[in-house]
Amino acid sequence: MWRLVPLKLGRLSRALKLAALGSLLVLMLLHSPSLLASWQRNELADRRFLQLNKCPACFGTSWCRRFLNGQVGFETWGRLRLLDFLNVKNVYFAQYGEPREGGRRRVVLKRLGSQRELAQLDQSICKRATGRPRCDLLQAMPRTEFARLNGDVRLLTPEAVEGWSDLVHCPSQRLLDRLVRRYAETKDSGSFLLRNLKDSERMQLLLTLAFNPEPLVLQSFPSDEGWPFAKYLGACGRMVAVNYVGEELWSYFNAPWEKRVDLAWQLMEIAEQLTNNDFEFALYLLDVSFDNFAVGPRDGKVIIVDAENVLVADKRLIRQNKPENWDVWYESKFDDCDKEACLSFSKEILCARVTVDHNYYAVCQNLLSRHATWRGTSGGLLHDPPSEIAKDGRLEALLDECTNPKKRYGRFQAAKELRGYLAQLSHNVR
């Protein structure tokens, strides 16, 4: 009798799967004309699909020529609009190629928000401009705060945008000048003066800063200069293009030990670079999970591919203003929650201290240690070490101290030693 129960449950499970598959096939047949049309047509050359008609309530136009000329095309399954309901994050994979280059390369396309978030953005703009939830965005944008810097305003100042997003939670003038000078959605980039931007470009800059500042992070801290972010390529309407890096870090969760050690070392090096660098900008990662990093297939390099939640603190400004306890080392508190990718932090403290261990804590807790949980797994990237390393105990001790320190300022020392130990292990196994 007991053996029949799992058998029946198994049959029920298979029946449900077949029913779901059958429903999907029926939907595909019902939509077959539009399905065939979407398969054959390059929708990335369609102005309305790109939502170019919503500019200047958009992210830019620097890549419009490439899109509209058909140089960017969805990869196979990306052509099926019927599957868009599964693509909650509105992230697509596509192929891009210049005719004169003769080849094509993979790129990632992002709308920078879900359909719901984008609809809420439109409603917010309309309500602020007209008091109604629907309107002509082209007419409404000049009547919102995104147009406050139009005209003869010389600089983008902290007072104008402070708190709009994580990137500018506590902006310095030096950071904002960098954002404007490196803004890629204008032909006249290179100047920190706002008056060198068109009114439409200023509104696009401010809207991006408020809605999802990831493009501005990638532009201001570019991969070409050694920053560990994906390369920004351009935008058209509400579609942003970035370079495809490789498979997400999660796909390496069960990779050979040697590979995982190398990736862990790189992650700790990223934490160090973003915390301490010659530019004296501290870039704190507020959302750290396996999905937010990717690994290059050729060079094996770890890159951050989701930079929406990055807080930038200007250490020079902190030293200059000397807020209360500015020179006291800040230790992040361990958060033993039952959810995935938990982090505990205070944005106000991150903005007011020169020495902060947040990035070490985030990487150790959410990616490397036994406390890291993701998609139903636990143990972190460094799970199941070889017997000799497990027996030695040093790795586990460093990871525990980096995650939940028992000594005062223990995480700072543990992170330093962990970087050295991982470097030693990775060199030994190469």
UniProtKB/Swiss-Prot annotation:
Regarding tissue, the record states: Expressed in heart, brain, liver, spleen, kidney, lung, thymus, testis, ovary and muscle.
Q: Is GTP-binding included in the keywords of this UniProt record?
A: no
One GO BP annotation of this record: negative regulation of smooth muscle cell apoptotic process
Main location per the UniProt record: Golgi
Classify the source by domain of life: Eukaryota
Q: List the disulfide bonds.
A: none
**Matching PANTHER family, A to Z?**
DIVERGENT PROTEIN KINASE DOMAIN 2A, GH11358P
What is the protein's name according to its record?
Divergent protein kinase domain 2A
Q: Which gene encodes it?
A: Dipk2a
